[in-house]
């Protein structure tokens, strides 16, 4: 882990039921039934985005509203979803057992022919399970924004100076993909798609053991 991206076709079949349209509808239902619905005392943290920019619209509170946003080529992200679903919480706990550290689960809803975010990188290790539809992932090693220059507001336009080789992977339902921390990536939805993204910030000793 930590050296290069790695795709595993067909190895995420157990994750298919963790995020589908029914799960999305149930999670969004927390807006209606209040804090008690999720057992966490808070509503889902939902973002709406398009091509790397947040869109200032009310967050969807039903599957119907999600469909309406998708018809406008807008993507939806549910952050820290492990706080609102027992099975997603168990998934996060499983990752934390294997790779001790801070783990969060994000859920992505992306319409066909769109990119929710532009070229960017994450400070955490990213593991992706595709649960519905098809996505193309484009990945490059980050040689222009070294880790020792971390910033709260990273300059993603630096990708224009990147000269590392371009890698790609097409994910269909049931596939896994690992993207190392701080590697550039761009995601394009070929079909309407649902995916689970597990972000892990490992403790330093764990990185040394597994690196």
Q: What positions do the PLM features span?
A:
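Fe(II)/2-oxoglutarate
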Residues: 1-7, 13, 159
């Amino acid at each position: 882990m930590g050296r290069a991206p790695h795709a595993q076709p067909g190895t995420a079949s157990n994750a298919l039921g963790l995020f589908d349209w029914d799960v999305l509808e149930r999670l969004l239902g927390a807006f209606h039934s209040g804090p008690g619905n999720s057992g966490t005392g808070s509503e889902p943290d939902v973002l709406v985005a398009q091509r790397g920019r947040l869109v200032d619209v009310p967050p969807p509170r039903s599957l119907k509203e999600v469909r309406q946003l998708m018809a406008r080529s807008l993507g939806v992200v549910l952050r820290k979803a492990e706080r609102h679903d027992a099975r997603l919480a168990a998934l996060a706990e499983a990752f934390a057992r294997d790779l001790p550290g801070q783990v969060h689960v994000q859920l992505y809803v992306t319409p066909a022919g769109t990119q929710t975010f532009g070229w960017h990188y994450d400070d955490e290790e990213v593991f992706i399970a595709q649960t519905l539809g098809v996505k193309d992932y484009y990945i490059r090693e980050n040689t222009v924004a070294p880790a020792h220059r971390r910033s709260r507001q990273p300059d993603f336009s630096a990708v224009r100076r990147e000269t590392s080789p371009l890698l790609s992977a097409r994910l269909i339902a049931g596939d896994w993909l690992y993207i190392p921390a701080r590697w550039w990536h761009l995601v394009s939805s070929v079909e309407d798609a649902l995916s689970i993204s597990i972000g892990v910030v490992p403790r330093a000793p764990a990185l040394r053991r597994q690196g």
